[in-house]
């Protein structure tokens, strides 16, 4: 009677093991599902078998205008759709010549055909009747730009040299113009050529310092006279205290019996600025180049 009792224990032990295995498999599947879901969010692809690959159509995310707003493509598309930017691009590329209507890009054209206006985010402004700036802009008539002719663009101004040109942007070099009364160094020119010792811009001396220019009246400028002592204001002498030979006959012409001693004594002190005074009065002095000099003998009554 004691033998059948041990036979009842193994079925209870096997039932507990079955429940335990089911619970373990359930937990493993749940953990695997959570891992695949997390990896999908990070961008990984999870496949149930090695041969099955997902279709490309399933991999592509649904197109949504609200997603990826800060990407480069979105920024470029917004720039192209702007009318002012499209006009600037057309001018830089040089596609439009003369008068023409600014055409929008292909992306803007297709979107305008579908919705009647390009896709954009609606803006709300307080205190304005218009609900959106972009919507009110699309209601305006097409912008017509009156282009300038090529002759006006390519016609250079006097003194300009084009260095670099791209579209409507040009880099030009303008030569500096100087006035009529200025040198290149910025100093004014001296137009008073009649001043004493002045030089004209041609390099020649003026009438006061040398030869006068042809076709102009000769103007003489008198140099300032130096103050002379009373001892030197006598008859001009040259050649070491002797009188000029041209003055001897005139000095002794009136009184042939007079002696030339006072003249020699007064003139022996040195040369006087008599010739310079003659030049100042317009009469050039004649220097005695001959070796013959008239010297009256001492003690003689006359020559």
From Swiss-Prot:
Residues 46-67, 111-303 are annotated as: Disordered. Its main location: membrane. Residues 148-158, 172-188 have a biased composition (Basic and acidic residues). The keyword Transmembrane applies. It is a single-pass membrane protein. The modification Phosphoserine is found at residue 52. GO terms for biological process: positive regulation of cell-substrate adhesion; positive regulation of p38MAPK cascade. GO terms for cellular component: plasma membrane. Pfam families: RELT. The keyword Transmembrane applies. It is found in: Cell membrane. Keywords: Cell membrane, Membrane, Phosphoprotein, Transmembrane, Transmembrane helix. The chain crosses the membrane at residues 15-35. Interacts with RELT, RELL1, OXSR1, PLSCR1 and TRAF2. Belongs to the RELT family. This is RELT-like protein 2.
